[in-house]
Amino acid sequence: VQSFLEFEKPIAELENKIADLRGLSTTENDVNIDDEIATLTAKVETTLTQVYSDLSAWQKTQVARHAGRPHFSDYVSRLITDFTPLAGDRGFSDDQAIMGGLGRFRGQSVVIIGHEKGKDTNSRLHHNFGMARPEGYRKAVRLMDLADRYGLPVISLVDTSGAYPGVGAEERGQAEAIARSTAKCLDLKVPMISAIVGEGGSGGAIAIAAANRVIMLEHSVYAVISPEGCASILWHTADKAPEAAKQLKLTAQDLLSLSVIDKIISEPIGGAHRDPGTTIDSLGNAINDYLTDLSDIPGDELRQAREDKFLAMGAL
């Protein structure tokens, strides 16, 4: 069942009319409803194009959080063959908010890491809604160590509202784990490509996104804090989240203009949740192009270029 966001009400009404028409018996009174369905379907496409061509930062945040967007497991199943997952941090436990392993991407051996939010109530609880604990970032470091050791490119997929802020996570060194994972990204001597595929929230995102190339899906977001968190700090109310989203410059379009990211991947009309397969294939093509470009660059140069890239951000 398609779920609709608040600003998609005109689209929802049209979709509901189409569903009602399809539910009618076409034999009753010899009424042919195909033409009416075709007209409404065309109107849905037109309305989708109009609505999605002018989304606000807050609306893009809502799209980025849509439960129907492709998840890490979807990308792996469509893009990676011979996937072998790696579990645990060899210190405390196996965090399920960050998944990863080794596999083949279009014939090339790679290490892939990413946040997994889960798709239903049980899986979301299992994956802690994509909010990683320290063990998740330490698992990511293990995977990056393997990539460095065996000369394998790293692909990371970011989709998290932020690292888990619980007491236990803090007691086990959340800040240190995030810092160490970020440092490992910057120290790699193999190509690293990161993609923001949904939410990119704060240190929980950058910990696996300090890459040679950072790309974003068209309606994903990437910021130092959530709009609700920012609004609560600045205005002492989460009701100001739409204004905070605008001021945070968190959209892919804003971040490309600021040179924080390298490329925007177009989503199907109506967002990635309307056509996950096409979205995944488009992202795969972009990743493949960047891996090809970076494959012949020596490791020391990759490392230095990555460091220079991030040191240059914010420079006047």
Predicted segments, located by residue:
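Terminal peptide-recognition signature
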Residues: 14, 56, 112, 159, ...
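Gly/Ser/Thr-rich beta-alpha loop segments that engage phosphate groups in nucleotides
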Residues: 109, 116, 132, 164, ...
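Glycine-rich beta-alpha loop segments
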Residues: 82, 92-94, 100, 105-157, ...
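Short hinge/gating elements
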Residues: 61-64, 125-129, 270-273
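Short active-site-adjacent helix-start/loop capping segments
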Residues: 70-72, 120-122, 164-166
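Conserved catalytic cores of soluble enzyme domains
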Residues: 158-288, 292
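Intrinsically disordered, low-complexity segments enriched in small/flexible residues
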Residues: 1-109, 277-316
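Short, motif-level signal for alpha-helix interfacial/capping segments enriched in acidic residues
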Residues: 33-36, 136-137, 230
